[in-house]
Regions:
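The conserved beta-strand core of Leucine-Rich Repeat
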Residues: 1-55, 59-77, 88-100, 114-125, ...
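Short, T/G/N/S-enriched strand-turn elements that build extracellular solenoid repeat scaffolds
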Residues: 5, 31, 82, 105-108
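Leucine-rich solenoid repeat modules
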Residues: 84-197
Length: 197
């Protein structure tokens, strides 16, 4: 872990960062990561950050636009979500968690800048939350590293797939709304000449 923290401390202008399969101790890493404020795309297991800091504050990441977050602990996940909601540029958030059902409502309600919330787990939410265009459920990429590499280099990745799924969801909702809507003046005009027997 010391090597990772050392490398990161020497490179402060990082825009794309993925930290996976790390082994502790994580304290040096957490303190270095909070100083890399230039990161825009970030993928990490929240355990690396929250292990000893249950109230890890995401607000230092002012430039963060895309966050792929693995959450293994509900209490820590809720604490992290509260500060995530205040990030001014965070528009894309992916959750890989068994606690997605508990976290999605918090994020949808409190994240005004969030445009896309991806869940990689099956979830059972109320109808209004499932109808929210920001929420998209996907299968996890088979090759995370390859997917991350493609996205970091401007190619198609799971974010692209999620945006396409979001567009399909919006089209389906518009089509459903057209199917069930009745133009009341036309309905009245069409039925006004009917006589009751």
């Amino acid at each position: 872990m010391g090597v990772v923290a050392e490398i990161l401390s020497m490179n402060r202008n990082i825009q794309n960062l993925a930290l996976w399969s790390l082994e502790g101790p994580f304290d040096p890493l957490a303190s270095v990561i909070t100083q890399i404020i230039s990161v825009q795309r970030f993928s990490i297991n929240q355990y690396y950050l929250f292990q000893r800091q249950p109230h890890f504050d995401w607000t230092n990441f002012k430039n963060l636009t895309h966050l792929d977050l693995v959450i293994d602990d509900l209490e820590l996940g809720i604490a992290g979500c509260k500060s995530l909601c205040s990030l001014p540029l965070l528009t894309h958030l992916a959750l890989n968690s068994g606690f997605t059902e508990q976290l999605v409502p918090i994020l949808l309600t409190n994240s005004s800048n969030l445009k896309l919330l991806v869940s990689f787990c099956a979830i059972d939410l109320d109808v209004d939350q499932m109808q929210d265009l920001r929420l998209v459920c996907l299968s996890a990429p088979i090759e995370w590293q390859e997917d991350w590499y493609y996205g970091a280099h401007g190619r198609l990745d799971f974010w692209s797939e999620a945006e396409t799924a979001q567009q399909r969801k919006a089209r389906r909702q518009r089509a459903r709304a057209r199917d069930v809507s009745i133009d009341l003046p036309d309905f009245i005009a069409a039925t006004s000449n009917l006589r009751l027997a």
